[in-house]
Curated annotation (Swiss-Prot):
Its main location: nucleus. SUPFAM superfamilies: Eukaryotic type KH-domain (KH-domain type I) (SSF54791). Residues 1-32, 432-455, 467-616 are annotated as: Disordered. Residues 1-11, 565-575, 598-610 have a biased composition (Basic and acidic residues). It is found in: Nucleus. GO terms for cellular component: nucleus. Residues 198-304 form the KH domain. Residues 432-449, 475-484, 491-502 have a biased composition (Polar residues). Residues 534-564 have a biased composition (Pro residues). Pfam families: KH-I_KHDC4-BBP (PF22675), KH_12 (PF23469). This is Protein RIK.
Amino acid sequence: MTEDRAHKVADEPAASGRQSPERKKRKWDQPAEDLVSAAVTAAAVSGMPVMNFGALPGVVLPGVTAYGAATLPSVVPVPYSLPPHIAPSVLQNAAAAAQKLSQAKIPDEVIAREIVINDADPSVRYKLTKRQTQEEIQKCTNTVIITRGKYHPPNLLPDGEKPLYLHISAGSQLKDTAERIKAVDRAASMIEEILKQGTTSESISVPFSSSTGQAVRPFSASVFLGFDADPSLNITARIRGPNDQYINHIMKETGVTVVLRGKDSENLGSCHSEASQQPLHLYLTSMHLKNLEAAKVLAENLLDTVAAEFGASRISSSKVYGAVPPPQQLLAGVDTSGTKSDVHYIVGPNVLSGATHSFASTGVIAPVVAPAVTVQSGAPTYSGVPLPSNMAYPIPPANGGAFYSGYGDIYPQATPLQQLAFTLKHASSSATQAVPVTSTPTSMATKGNSILDAEMDKRSRRKFQELPVSKGPATESQNSQQGSKFVKTGLDSSGNIGSSSIAPPKKVHPGSNGMLPQEEADMPSHLSISTKMLPPPLKSMLPLPPRSMPPPPPKSMPPPPPKFPSDEFLSRNENKFFPLKEPTAPPRSFDAISVLPSERRPREPKEEKNKRHTCV
């Protein structure tokens, strides 16, 4: 009976094992490695001596045969004490244990570091929390920097939350533990260096290293307070705002670093520097010029508001500019030696009255020259552009208003209404100052004046004006009335100039019929001075005549007869502008006598009439 029961008990576990499914193997089912064997293998790798574990009772090492205490000394070096058939297995176990120890991963929180920046200077705190600064440090050290915590002002009670700090951890690309620790330490040292430099005056001007390795200096600007305030008013706190909100607002809006510097600024960094001797101001720095300009506007508004609160008048830093120098191209031809010319540009009616000008035998005239013209190396220049030496054109002013000597008498400094009043005032005045004289050949000057007078006469004449027909020989007055076609040559006119005085200029007003008045017709057209603005010199001017010219014709020689358009030309113009007039027939009347012969009906023969009567 006992044997049967024993068979049943032995069969029950086998049956239960068949029925229950096999469980999956997990890593927790594997037995842990013996601590003693691990220590032995580690010691073997490091070369440390191993004790005689065979003499210890109850301690059995896997793969190691126990030897007596008499055969082994107390301390035996491993490479020389192990038998040849045991050494390979021990070395393999030691290598595996060393690999496991090297692969053991230390938690990131053990390597990571935290640097509190809550109590740092506002500019440094903003710089460290800026993403651009953090990315620069991350690229250099292969770390990850995160801003955490909450900013706690100095006068605010703690609320249980961590103050503002930077969390530094190693990057995922670093596998070795030693490299991860070194990277975190390097990033922490860079942040601590920035915190230390923030207490000095050079904290803001630390250059960033660009991708090319070159140092890039940021742009900077200073916005001064503009007035002296009483130290007892604590104006620094008004500029900073509660908890530095005003300065932080400018930094957040524009991304520019803002630092309050100068006297009574309470800035520890500027206590022993040159900035402490300057007036109170906001020092702005940025890597982008556009952001710096935007920050300057906000800083100006902030200081204007503070000045209004204290009732002080403030001069804006952006408005304190000196006189803007003129462009370099204008300085080339303008004489700015300090003497300012007051010559009026509007020529009055008595400019040359009563003055007799004698000319040399070469024959020259005296044109009007603007005071802005400076003669350099024998040639007049205006705004750096030399004029042709053979021209005698007067240079008109840039405008009719007053001129400012700081710009070399070029830029008008008056409104259009003031310029108009200035022009009318000096147009009616009769006294003007003398005008400089330049000498040019007579023929070219008279040709230029005759062309200008001809253009003015063409503007004043009507389109279909008829020229008067002179019965007698043409006089000099007729030549001046008939435009540029009848102007005398320059040689003829030069002879008259040398023996007569120049008459005062008069304004030309055409009469009702479009012709010049009789009293103005006595003066030749080439001696008339026009008060209107003259056009620029013509480029297509004829060359100078040769010196070997024939003598001028005698004065008694009559001028050439006037050239009138032919009948064919007049008829062509009439057909062009006027419709052709067809002859109209006289009015008809019902009387038979007034009917034209061509319109009368032909008479019928008498025979046809008789036939008609017979038929009826």
